[in-house]
């Protein structure tokens, strides 16, 4: 009589031969216990010994005999509540055609524009990363008032970015952070050393995922272009392990729709689907999401077109803006300038809060932020900051508004619609309306409004 225990069984689908070998070795075992903290994959390779049943849409999904998810563990005090501090901002870059582009991270833009704005935000040379790392370090200082050995982790896309982020943190804190690179033979020892110390920061290239245990990590910066649900869940899993009741975790991330959707769905239980759902955000057969595919294609196109045009993608400038706090499926707070009193209200949240206290405290901070905004609007508060108004109009609505205004102006002047659009494009810069960002369309809306009046 044999009991076989398979831990992290989702890896059994990593290759056909791997899965076949597992089946051949253990198919006739009397009992099998399959365990995993992430019971899904970024592809459709079946996981050995897992039962799949069709859902309402006919998609075959995995079925567990027993599930203990994040939501239940949170209520039991086994894991920490995670607050996501989302940052938007203004981005400018040169595309592979030599066209200078600008867009707001968090605006309703096309997916390729969002991917390029996201890429610009993650540039170590830009202000966005400097401002977000500074905010994250302030948050870590606040958490360490209650949890003296709390540590922070920056998750980078590649080695070059990781080195850049490490240099930024050294400049901000005066202390060089632990740098973990996948090709470094001493990486595992360095992670263990960091785990046992009270150092503030560690920077790693994606490799800090499952199997890496650093319980004191309490603040994270998600500075990678990866947006697969599996990687996101494993990355956030580095911050949720509770050592004592009341510890919280804070993760800073860019306001990218795919990431904010994953943050909102943190407490939802996911299963592995053997069939692809027909939606735009589904992961592709190679495990990449549409956002990641666009990012990769943009980088490949940049390299190919450089020889033909002499241009390549170049981040020009970036500036961060506090957007909101995401917690327990809800949004808290309002857009605010970096360094403002409103942002500090959230960076200064206590490091020790029970799950049922977090939402109440966030609501109190949002109400206080509203009072600060009102006081600034009345002129009763002059703190050197302006009140940031969020963008409510969608890209489709902006295009519709621009076309309506162009129609009005064309009737007034007798010009053709196309002629007016061409003049606006020459005056404001940027590509045709179909490829223009929300910010570029807004500039044209503002100009045609001035002409109408």
Where are these regions (language model features)?
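Alpha-helical scaffold elements adjacent to nucleotide-binding pockets in ATP/GTP-utilizing enzyme cores
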Residues: 4, 17, 21-28, 48, ...
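Conserved helicase motor "Helicase C" RecA-like lobe of SF1/SF2 P-loop NTPases
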Residues: 157-181
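SF2 helicase catalytic motif II
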Residues: 1-34, 38-41
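Long, largely alpha-helical accessory region at the distal end of helicase-like NTP-driven motors
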Residues: 122-124, 128-135, 139, 258-408
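Positively charged, phosphate-engaging catalytic surfaces used for nucleic-acid and nucleotide handling
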Residues: 378-453
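Conserved RecA-like ASCE P-loop NTPase motor core of nucleic-acid helicases/translocases
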Residues: 150-157
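Conserved RecA-like P-loop NTPase helicase motor core
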Residues: 176-285
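Interdomain helical connector at the RecA1-RecA2 junction of SF1/SF2 helicase-like NTPases
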Residues: 44-149
């Amino acid at each position: 009589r044999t009991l076989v225990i398979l831990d992290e069984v989702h890896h059994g689908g990593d290759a056909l031969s791997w899965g076949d070998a597992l089946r051949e070795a253990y198919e006739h075992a009397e009992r099998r216990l399959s365990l995993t903290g992430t019971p899904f994959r970024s592809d459709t390779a079946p996981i050995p010994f897992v039962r799949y049943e069709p859902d309402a849409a006919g998609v075959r999904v995995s079925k567990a005999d027993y599930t203990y998810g994040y939501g239940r563990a949170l209520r039991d005090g086994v894991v920490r509540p995670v607050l996501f501090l989302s940052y938007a901002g203004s981005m400018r870059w040169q595309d592979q055609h030599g066209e200078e582009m600008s867009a707001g991270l968090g605006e309703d833009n096309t997916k390729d524009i969002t991917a390029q704005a996201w890429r610009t935000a993650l540039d170590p040379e830009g202000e966005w990363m400097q401002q977000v790392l500074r905010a994250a370090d302030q948050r870590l200082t606040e958490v360490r008032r209650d949890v003296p050995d709390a540590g922070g982790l920056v998750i980078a896309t590649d080695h070059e970015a990781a080195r850049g982020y490490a240099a930024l943190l050294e400049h901000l804190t005066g202390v060089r952070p632990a740098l973990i690179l996948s090709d470094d033979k001493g990486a595992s020892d360095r992670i263990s050393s960091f785990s046992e110390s009270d150092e503030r920061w560690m920077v790693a290239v994606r490799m800090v995922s499952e199997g890496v245990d650093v319980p004191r990590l309490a603040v994270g910066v998600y500075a990678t272009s990866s947006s697969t649900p599996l990687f996101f869940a494993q990355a956030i899993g580095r911050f949720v392990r509770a050592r004592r009741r009341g510890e919280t975790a804070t993760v800073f991330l860019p306001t990218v729709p795919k990431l904010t959707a994953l943050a909102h769905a943190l407490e939802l239980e996911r299963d592995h689907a053997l069939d692809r759902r027909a939606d735009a955000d589904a992961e592709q057969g190679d495990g990449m999401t549409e956002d990641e595919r666009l990012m990769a294609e943009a980088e490949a196109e940049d390299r190919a077109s450089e020889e033909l045009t002499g241009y390549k993608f170049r981040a020009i400038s970036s500036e961060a803006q506090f957007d909101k706090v995401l917690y327990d499926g809800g949004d808290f707070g309002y857009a605010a300038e970096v360094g403002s009193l409103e942002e500090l209200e959230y960076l200064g949240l206590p490091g020790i809060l029970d799950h049922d206290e977090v939402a109440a405290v966030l609501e109190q901070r949002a109400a206080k932020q509203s009072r600060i905004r009102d006081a600034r609007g009345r002129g009763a508060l002059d703190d050197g900051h302006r009140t940031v108004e969020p963008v409510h109009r969608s890209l489709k609505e902006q295009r519709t508004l621009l076309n309506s205004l162009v129609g009005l102006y064309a009737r007034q002047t007798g010009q053709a619609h196309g002629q007016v659009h061409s003049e606006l494009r020459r005056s404001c810069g940027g590509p045709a309306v179909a490829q223009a960002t929300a910010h570029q369309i807004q500039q044209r809306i503002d100009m045609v409004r001035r002409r109408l009046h």
